[in-house]
């Protein structure tokens, strides 16, 4: 029975390029999940967009001496160019700079305001007398009061993940000039999170299918007690507050950006000429998944659900499969540390499926995982080239050369051959279960294990020897190996769409796997094959030294 799946993916700040940490954290797992569900025949809507209004953008604009709009548009266009290179299959990708998004965000604000979930309050905010302005949260840095991390921001500590406000920081300073700010009174609007605390606890306690790290973090945060949070800032860049007399204030990005999932859905529907089509993905039995990095957990398991509860009539998240951090040399990817590995740069030298494979096999699902170029080369050469790619190349080459580019007659299969076919079918069932539950590392491990088993079968049967004395016996062995390849092209497709499409074409099935089902499709005798090209390329050991030198390590 088909399902309807909504996939919301974290919105990247349009202030820098994409690096591997971004891809492993949210974008690759979301794409894997979307491709998997489409192949199952499910209805899928996967949306995201560029976050154009965050303070990181205004900070960069000031550093470069240009407008925030210019910075945001520059990186939005770079993102748009990067997604196809990565094979990210958005149903719709937009930005927070659209009139549709501003309207949707303002409607959400007014709905919550009219219901009493947003209220005005006079608060003390950091004011830099040297810069002569109020400082939004990311313009203030200092030491986290919880974990003592010295690089915490005025909105959140990246080290321990706890949301903060600037007044909580120790040794705080203005990010722009380095001077300590003073605190002055200003009026802001607050989201009444405290009103949703008990309802959120009851709701989260039902989410036993969530990843343990996500569930525990959320419950711990909830049981510490929710504080109301300001949702406006003294800025001139962002979505204007939809109330008269507050022209100098904007909706703050953590409130505004999550509304992008809804505004993107509406924009997608309008682009299809069906303006109400978004509604089926936000109601009924649709399951909503949000793919994010761990620094965004509270915004998607507490704040966004509270906003949806207050608004009413919209589905709450079914799952928030947040990943931990991908690190290098045990440090989080960071431009300031000079250890970021930029996506466009990597893809200018290596195949997209090679990158997707390593990031999938090493995905930080429950704990931080470390990226290394040595592992990149080893896995490419040992697993993609020598195991999976070699299996496809030698089987299809032998069949094309010796059986006129067609699937041969294979006769009666022996027990060993039937066992491999059964294992292939079982692998598809097991990967189906793993992918359904967002266990991506397990799914790709199962697929590669089947490739290893198929190679063992081929080595035992040795069709290159059989063909010299018994062409029919060789045909049986090669046919069974093609059955294994047929299963592998499906299992690997969500992870490795480019090479899976080519393998599917070589096998005579065509390249559009999403038009099939998550089943083992048997090659038909006489089916036309295409002489194969290697699926993957071997990498030289020198790559390790060259790439670490590029990073200055």
From Swiss-Prot:
SUPFAM superfamilies: Anticodon-binding domain of a subclass of class I aminoacyl-tRNA synthetases, Methionyl-tRNA synthetase (MetRS), Zn-domain, Nucleotidylyl transferase. GO terms for biological process: methionyl-tRNA aminoacylation. InterPro entries: Anticodon_Met, Met-tRNA_ligase_1, Met-tRNA_synth, Methionyl/Leucyl_tRNA_Synth, MetRS_core, MetRS_Zn, Rossmann-like_a/b/a_fold, tRNAsynth_Ia_anticodon-bd. Gene3D superfamilies: HUPs, Isoleucyl-tRNA Synthetase, Domain 1, Methionyl-tRNA synthetase, Zn-domain. It catalyses: tRNA(Met) + L-methionine + ATP = L-methionyl-tRNA(Met) + AMP + diphosphate. Zn(2+) binds at residues 144, 147, 157, 160. The keyword Membrane does not apply. The keyword Isomerase does not apply. Its EC number is 6.1.1.10. A motif ('HIGH' region) lies at residues 12-22. Binds 1 zinc ion per subunit. It comes from the Bacteria. CDD domains: Anticodon_Ia_Met, MetRS_core. GO terms for molecular function: ATP binding; metal ion binding; methionine-tRNA ligase activity. ATP binds at residue 335. Its main location: cytoplasm. HAMAP family: Met_tRNA_synth_type1. Is required not only for elongation of protein synthesis but also for the initiation of all mRNA translation through initiator tRNA(fMet) aminoacylation. Belongs to the class-I aminoacyl-tRNA synthetase family. MetG type 1 subfamily. Monomer. This is Methionine--tRNA ligase. It comes from Dehalococcoides mccartyi (strain CBDB1).
